[in-house]
Amino acid sequence: MEVKMKILLDEDGIRRSITRISYEIIERNKTVDNIVLVGIKSRGDILAERIKQKLLEVENIDAPLETIDITYYRDDIDRKNFDLDIKDTEFKTNLTGKVVVIVDDVLYTGRTIRAGLDAILSKSRPAKIQLACLIDRGHRELPIRADFIGKNIPTSHSENIEVYLKELDGKEEVVIL
């Protein structure tokens, strides 16, 4: 069976989405000097770096950037057989009292974001947590919504969204399969 692929965002579309998200973060927050960006591996961290660069370009604010690996906090792993080589997230920046913007590539069920929230809240007490995602595809299983969205793409459960970024994949596009 042939898999049909449709490009949802090309390189320019991704760049424009990141620019819009960055401006929305600036507009939503009274000051951006209290913002910490937290990217979820393995594409949210790259998108967070791009937002960081845009905030620096527009507001001349060098927002701290953290990366989280949510593997330790997932709700679909068997903790008894947990791989002890997986390290818990340690933040270099104190997130307590800060406005934390979690960045991820695709928002789907909300479970990845819940794991990210657990990772952050187990270590700190931010003043506020906001969520930025490049693609919101719907189908939540948890009451989570994004504050900043690049593009809303309603999908069926049988469809997949793939985000390709130059840093990891050598190409820049978002496709639906």
UniProtKB/Swiss-Prot annotation:
Catalytic reaction equation(s): UMP + diphosphate = 5-phospho-alpha-D-ribose 1-diphosphate + uracil
Presence of the UniProt keyword ATP-binding in the record: no
A single GO BP: regulation of DNA-templated transcription
Any GO molecular function: uracil phosphoribosyltransferase activity
Keyword set, alphabetical order: Glycosyltransferase, Transcription, Transcription regulation, Transferase
Its EC number(s): 2.4.2.9
Class in the EC hierarchy, top level: transferase
UniProt-annotated binding residues for substrate: S42, R43, D104, D105, V106, L107, Y108, T109, G110, R111, T112, R137
Transmembrane residue ranges: none
InterPro entries: PRibTrfase_dom, PRTase-like, PyrR, PyrR_bifunctional
Signal sequence segment: none
Superkingdom, natural source: Bacteria
Function: Regulates the transcription of the pyrimidine nucleotide (pyr) operon in response to exogenous pyrimidines.
PANTHER family per the UniProt record, alphabetical: BIFUNCTIONAL PROTEIN PYRR
Family of this protein: Belongs to the purine/pyrimidine phosphoribosyltransferase family. PyrR subfamily.
Name of the molecule in the record: Bifunctional protein PyrR
Annotated source species: Fusobacterium nucleatum subsp. nucleatum (strain ATCC 25586 / DSM 15643 / BCRC 10681 / CIP 101130 / JCM 8532 / KCTC 2640 / LMG 13131 / VPI 4355)
